[in-house]
Structure formats: C-alpha cells, structure tokens
Amino acid sequence: AASDVYKRQVSHKGLDLVQAVMDDLMQEDIQLVIIGTGEQNYENMFRSYADQYPEKMSANIVFDNKLAHETYAGGDLVLMPSKMEPCGLTQLIAMRYGTVPIIRETGGLYDTVPALNPETMEGRGFTFKSYNAHDMLDAVRRAAAFYQDSKHWKLLQKNDMKFDSSWNQSVQEYWQIYRSML
C-alpha cells in the first residue's frame, strides 16, 4: 500500500508522531510520498529518510498542487495524524480520488471520516483516538492489512468516492432541524 502525507510540515499536523515511528514505518510493506513545505526539522527528516530508503520513500519538499492531485490519484492512503484540525480538506479531496484516509479522531477529520467497521463496511477510513505515535502506527498497520483484501478495499474506495461533502447534504440536515422546530 502506498501512503502519502501532503500538508504543511508543521508540528500541529502530527508530524512529531510520524517522526517518532519513522524507523518502524520504513519496515512496513508500504511506500511513503511526502509533499509540502514547513518546519526545517521535518523537511530535513523526510529528506534524510528518502535518501536512506529511496525504494520506500519520496520526499517532495515543494508546494505543488498538480503533484498533490497526481499523488491523490495514484495513492492508496493518506495519513493525517493531526493534533488538531478544525476542518480539513485533504481527507475530502483524497476520498474523492479513492485515496483512503488514516486520521486521528479530532475536529473536522473526526466529523468526515468515521472509522471503518470491516464487518459491515460502514465508515470511510482508519482512525486512532489518542495523540500517540504507536496508536497511529497501529492504524497504518490496520490499513495496510485491509488493503490486502482487494474486493473490500475497492468497495471502501468506491464508498469514499461517493461521499457527498457538498452543501446540499448540510442544507438538507439544517432544513430538517428547522422544520422539526416549527
């Protein structure tokens, strides 16, 4: 499974969690694509790991919207371990492409990416609650294991691609609440 991290490379995006388990991530059967700019220590870390593991990781320390969309289109997973995320667009864009989110349950990420229940196929991605590197690593491992079941993986991708995050759905929900109050 390929996972990508596309965001501003700053600590509140959870990159300290990624940093804490980078050696473990490099041992998993995944490839990482990093796109974005930010704090120098994270940029340097990603470059260093990309140099050490060129077959496992690509560090693109640039802001390149076209490359980001190409990565969403070609990726399998997007990792968003944010400490806080009031809204979040990355997961919505990723799902539109069929790229499954791995998120920490916070803010807008929690609102838009309910945890997948593999038995019922309800949910839209893989989640972890605690702001903890090993919980994040566990979510990555669960996602990579689920990826091996191609039939269910494709179903999850299709469900994510159909998710309606437009205002149409919100307007309907507000309208129902308004009508119930009359």
Stretch-by-stretch model annotation:
Residues 8-10, 38:
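Short donor-sugar binding/catalytic loops of nucleotide-sugar-dependent glycosyltransferases
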Residues 29-68:
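Nucleotide-activated donor-binding/catalytic signature segment of Leloir-type glycosyltransferases, i.e.
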Residues 167-182:
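C-terminal alpha-helical cap of glycosyltransferases
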